[in-house]
Amino acid sequence: MKKVEFPLFGENEYMFLNIGRLIDIERMTGKPAGDIIKNQSLDLGMLTIILSVALRHHKMRTPQWYAEKMQELVEEGIELETDIQIPVVKCIAGSGILGKAVYYKLFPEEMTDSASKELTAERKNARKGR
């Protein structure tokens, strides 16, 4: 589980997702957590739900609260994709649910020699299985 710095809604805030939190997102949205990224269904409603779950260790805020704050931030000139969507995607990948290859693609600074060798071996095995 990776903590992703996210100070947009409060100083020193970070978000994270673990299996329990991903289950909460699935219950709230009716969609499998992995499908959110794979099917590119990260719309505004989904963003507010994910933010309410991924940041709840700081304060319990509703998706509606995040929608209102996002509106204010957009009016102030933030970029939704750069400032909100990309960190949320990193947070989802940081949970590990999308697999090691996606994780290391988004967090290349954490790639070690042993992890690189493991990913290479997994790719070779996947090709053999085709």
Regions picked out by a protein language model, each given a short descriptive name:
Residues L8-N12:
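Glycine-centered positions within short beta-strands or beta-hairpins
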Residues L51:
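Active-site/pore-lining binding-face segments in mid-to-C-terminal subdomains
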Residues M1-P7, R27-Q40, G45, H57-R130:
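Charged interaction scaffolds used for protein-protein
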Residues N18:
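Residue-level signal for threonine
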Residues A54:
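Short, structured surface segments that line ligand/substrate-binding pockets
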Residues M15, I23-T29:
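Short amphipathic alpha-helical "interface-anchor" segments enriched in bulky aromatics
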